Amino acid sequence: MTTAPETSGNWIDEHHNGVRYGLEGRVLVEETSPFQRITVIDSQRYGKGLLLDGCWMTAEHQERHYHEALVHPALCSAKAIERVLVIGGGDGGTARECLRYPGVKHLDMVEIDGRVVDLSQEHLPSIGGGCWHDPRFHLTIGDGIAWAAEAENAFYDVVLVDGSDPTGPAEGLFNRAFFSNCCRILKPGGVFATQSESPEAFRQVHIDMVKLIRELFGHADPLYGWVPMYPSGWWSWTFAAKDAPRYLTVQSERAAAVAEGSAIWSPRWQQGAFNTIPAFIERELNQ
C-alpha cells in the first residue's frame, strides 16, 4: 500500500510495500480537497511536482516521460482525431500534448477535482502550457466515470484516461463497467489509451487491466517506459482498438508534425516501447 508522503529533513518520500521513493525539496502546499490530499512540492532534481494522496503524479522536469507516452501512440494512429476525450489529467499535460495536433478540433477534459486544476495552473503552469486558453479545449469539473456512462455511442475518435492509482476517486477508472463505456463511446477506427500502472510495483493490477481491456475491445497491448519518480520507475500504458491493433503503426504525416517538438516520443521509440514486454508478463497475459 501507499502511505502519506513523509518528510524527513529536506526529503519528501512516497512509501509503497516496503520501498520508498523520494525527492529532496520542500513542501509548498498541503491541503485536503473533498476528494483527496493534494501536495505541491519544489524539488531540487525535477522542479515543482504534484502528489495526490501521497502518490507522485507529475513534476516539471520529467512529466514528458508520461504525457508523451500516453498521447502520441494514440493520436498518431487513430483513423481520425477530431474529437478527443481526456478523463482525469488535471495538470493539463495530456491536453497540452493532444492540442499540438491541428487535426484535433474539440477536446473534452473531465477532471473530478477542481483544486488539482487550480493548483496546477498556479504552481505548475509549464505542464499545461497554453492548453487552458486553447479554443478547442473544454474543461468540465466532474466525474469522468459518469461522463463516459452518459456519452453517446461512437462519439469520440480518441479516449485517453489519465488517472491516478486505483484508490480514492480514481478507483472506478479500473473496472469493467468503465472500460465497457469507453469502448462503447469510441468511434470505429478510434484508439483508447490509459495509464496501466507498473508491471513491477503493481504487477497484478497491470496484468488484470491489460487482460480486461483486451477482452472488451478485441485488440490491446501494453507499452512500457520510464517515469523516474514513479514506484520502481518502470511504467506502462495500454492501448486498445476495436477494429485492429492500429496503435502499433503511426501515420507518418501526423508523426512528423509532432516528433521534432517531443522530448521522449518518436516513431522509433514507440516501436521499441511496444516490443519491450518482458517474457513473464507476456506469459501471464496469454494464460
Curated annotation (Swiss-Prot):
InterPro entries: PABS, PABS_CS, SAM-dependent_MTases_sf, Spermi_synthase, Spermidine_synt_N, Spermidine_synt_N_sf. The active site is at residue 162. It is an enzyme of class 2 (transferase). Spermidine binds at residues 67, 91. Pathway: Amine and polyamine biosynthesis; spermidine biosynthesis; spermidine from putrescine: step 1/1. One of its GO terms (biological process) is spermidine biosynthetic process. Pfam families: Spermine_synt_N (PF17284), Spermine_synth (PF01564). S-methyl-5'-thioadenosine binds at residues 36, 111, 143-144, 169. Homodimer or homotetramer. Catalyzes the irreversible transfer of a propylamine group from the amino donor S-adenosylmethioninamine (decarboxy-AdoMet) to putrescine (1,4-diaminobutane) to yield spermidine. NCBIfam families: PRK00811.1 (NF002010). This is Polyamine aminopropyltransferase.
